[in-house]
Swiss-Prot record:
This is Ceramide-binding protein SVF1. PANTHER family: CERAMIDE-BINDING PROTEIN SVF1-RELATED, SVF1-LIKE PROTEIN YDR222W-RELATED. Residues 219-231 have a biased composition (Acidic residues). One of its GO terms (molecular function) is ceramide binding. The lineage of its organism: Eukaryota, Fungi, Dikarya, Ascomycota, Saccharomycotina. It is found in: Golgi apparatus, cis-Golgi network membrane; Endoplasmic reticulum membrane; Cytoplasm; Nucleus. GO terms for cellular component: cis-Golgi network membrane; cytoplasm; endoplasmic reticulum membrane; nucleus. It is a peripheral membrane protein. The gene is SVF1. One of its GO terms (biological process) is response to oxidative stress. Belongs to the SVF1 family. Residues 203-218 have a biased composition (Basic and acidic residues).
């Protein structure tokens, strides 16, 4: 009972959690052990949950053009803090991985008068709609004049999820958990449409590192009270990017639900997708904090151009040539992602027998030299959330984003290596391995 009370309290307040142990996390990977883990998604899998307790729910369309190297995403974020404050945001990123100094734009815009209708989402000047056949999304956003988006995303392969219920639950009762994590995917799709961007001319020639340093300086000035507004006339460069029917971009789409405070659910994430003309590979992986025994939950997907070849959970993401950066995280300079499992055609008895004929392996590896941005998460969240999270010792969340269309390659089993475009996100949230009294300090 004490642990249940502590769990409920921490879910509301955001303080660090006690060390519950392995029995207080019920992973989706454990439930599919020894079985065929691949399940095709239905339209209902993409209905918004929108519960009345603390949660963050997102849909993200990751677009990438193999020919030009342009990569990015359009994302809707719907959040609820303690059941008292509901908000929605449209975030957008576009990055030219072959010419980073020419195009690297980020926008984040608060949504007004938003509403949910099953799988669809609406707000002023924004709509996301899934067709009745569960084969196509249409995203239109005019909420920010710097990033006007009109994209149609059409499935090339079936949707995919891990197991019948793709959720990981936190707590001592699976039927009444105090937290959860869930992901469902459309791994390989075409993306047709148009994106209009307005890029500040003074940042058009700056590298991601220079922009990050400039942002840090601005934040330091704000903290020191130097917040007097300086009137400046910003000149923009307008660009229109078109993804045509004859030369579409690829898209990886994911819907995610996190039903608890982010620093309670995970202490680190590895996320990657890779597209080539023949294949797609996806990794979504998180590791829990010490309070849930540093448990790793890993979801991998391998496709060809028409089919899901495998959904896997015996995966690894190796951080290579690591180096401690200016904020203190040990950031990799290279990554190697390996997915191992059984072909989607294998039956439960085939998986249990573990015969070689049903096994499959895929590897994506490459250098993490082309950084899109190092995102200081605490600099992006509202102040009232920041005050809650900053009270937890060892919590300093940063997301490292990388995009590369030239130096990553994919290998399926012992086949030939194929080049393609990769997007990688390495996220560090908390470093504390020991729960101490200081962890509960909210001052």
């Amino acid at each position: 009972m004490l642990k249940w009370i502590q769990g409920g309290l921490s879910a509301v307040t955001g303080i660090a959690e006690p060390e519950y142990g392995k029995e207080y996390i019920h992973t989706v990977t454990e439930r599919v052990e020894g079985k065929q883990p691949y399940r095709e998604t239905t339209r209902e899998d993409f209905f918004w949950k929108s519960p009345d307790h603390t949660n963050v729910e997102t849909v993200t369309f990751y677009f990438s053009n193999l020919a030009t190297g342009v990569v990015g995403f359009a994302q809707i974020i719907h959040s609820n803090i303690i059941g008292l404050h509901t908000a929605a945001q449209f975030t957008f990123r576009i990055f030219d991985s072959k010419n980073p100094e020419k195009l690297n734009l980020w926008t984040s815009t608060k949504l007004e008068n938003f509403r949910i209708e099953d799988a669809n989402f609406y707000a002023d000047d924004l709509s996301v709609e899934l067709n009745a056949d569960n084969t196509q999304y249409r995203l239109i956003s005019k909420v920010n004049e710097q990033s006007i988006v009109d994209l149609t995303v059409t499935r090339l392969t079936p949707g995919a999820k891990l197991g019948d219920d793709p959720s990981t639950y936190y707590g001592d009762n699976v039927e009444q958990p105090w937290g959860s994590m869930r992901h469902v995917f459309w791994p390989r799709n075409t993306c047709v449409g148009e994106i209009k961007v307005k890029i500040p001319k003074e940042t058009a020639e700056k590298t991601a590192e220079e922009q990050a340093q400039e942002k840090e300086q601005q934040e330091e000035q704000e903290q020191e009270g130097e917040d007097e507004a300086v009137e400046e006339t910003i000149e923009y460069e307008e660009r229109t990017l078109k993804f045509g029917e004859d030369d579409p971009s690829y898209c990886m789409f994911v819907m995610a639900f996190q039903g608890m405070k982010p620093h309670h659910a995970a202490k680190a994430w590895n996320f990657m997708f890779f597209h080539s003309k023949e294949n797609t590979m996806v990794l979504m992986e998180f590791t829990t904090p010490k309070s849930y025994s540093n448990t790793k939950v890993s979801i991998g997907i391998i496709t060809n151009d028409k089919e899901i070849l495998a959904v896997t959970h015996d995966n690894s993401a190796l951080h290579l040539n690591q180096e401690i950066d200016s904020v203190g995280w040990n950031v990799p300079k290279q990554i190697r992602v390996e997915l191992k499992g059984h072909k989607s055609s294998a039956k439960d008895e085939d998986v249990e027998a573990d015969n070689d004929e049903h096994k499959i392996k895929a590897v994506v590896e490459g250098p993490l030299e082309n950084m899109v941005e190092r995102i200081d998460v605490m600099g992006e969240v509202p102040n009232f959330v920041k005050n809650i999270v900053s009270g937890v010792a060892g919590t300093k969340p940063y997301i490292y984003q990388f995009g590369d269309a030239e130096n990553f390659h994919f290998q399926l089993d012992d086949g030939e290596k194929k080049n393609g475009l990769a997007w990688v996100e390495v996220t560090f949230i908390s470093e504390s391995e020991v729960v101490t009294e200081e962890s509960y300090n909210e001052e």
